[in-house]
């Protein structure tokens, strides 16, 4: 009698390799998406510290090179920004990201709004040199 030879089966190692590469691509793309859509060239600082991620809610106020103001990637004017800050809990961290080409006057206007509403929990983002 002849014995029936079983097939070697399907080799899944190349499939696993492809899945790991795709996973790495998805993870790297998701970190770029999480950084925000507004392109802001931050000023440099020698003593810049990395912020420690935590579970605290953060409101991001960005100013682009054309002095446009964005709150969490939504365009706003100073009056609308004042209303948002007024509604924001004083314990909520506000992260200020101002483009190095923007006017300092816009930055000062935002600081005045924060002071007007007694919001002292904020950080100013810079880029380490």
Swiss-Prot record:
The keyword Transmembrane helix applies. GO terms for biological process: protein transport. Disulfide bonds: none annotated. Residues 1-12 are cytoplasmic. It comes from the Bacteria. The chain crosses the membrane at residues 13-33. Signal peptide: none annotated. It is a single-pass type II membrane protein. One of its GO terms (cellular component) is plasma membrane. GO terms for molecular function: transmembrane transporter activity. Residues 34-129 are periplasmic. Pfam families: ExbD (PF02472). Keywords: Cell inner membrane, Cell membrane, Membrane, Protein transport, Transmembrane, Transmembrane helix, Transport. It is found in: Cell inner membrane. The accessory proteins ExbB and ExbD seem to form a complex with TonB. Belongs to the ExbD/TolR family. Involved in the TonB-dependent energy-dependent transport of various receptor-bound substrates. This is Biopolymer transport protein ExbD. It comes from Helicobacter pylori (strain ATCC 700392 / 26695) (Campylobacter pylori). The gene is exbD.
């Amino acid at each position: 009698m002849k014995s029936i030879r079983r097939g070697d089966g399907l080799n899944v190692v190349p499939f696993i390799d492809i899945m790991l590469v795709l996973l790495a691509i998805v993870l790297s793309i998701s970190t770029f998406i999480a950084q925000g859509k507004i392109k802001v060239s931050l000023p440099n600082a020698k003593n810049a510290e990395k912020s420690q991620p935590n579970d605290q809610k953060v409101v991001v106020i960005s100013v682009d090179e054309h002095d446009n103001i964005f709150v969490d990637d939504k365009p706003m004017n100073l009056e609308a920004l004042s209303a948002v800050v007024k509604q924001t809990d004083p314990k909520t961290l506000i992260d200020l990201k101002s483009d190095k080409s923007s006017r300092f006057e816009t930055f000062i206007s935002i600081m005045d709004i924060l002071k007007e509403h007694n919001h002292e929990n904020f950080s100013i983002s810079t880029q380490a040199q």
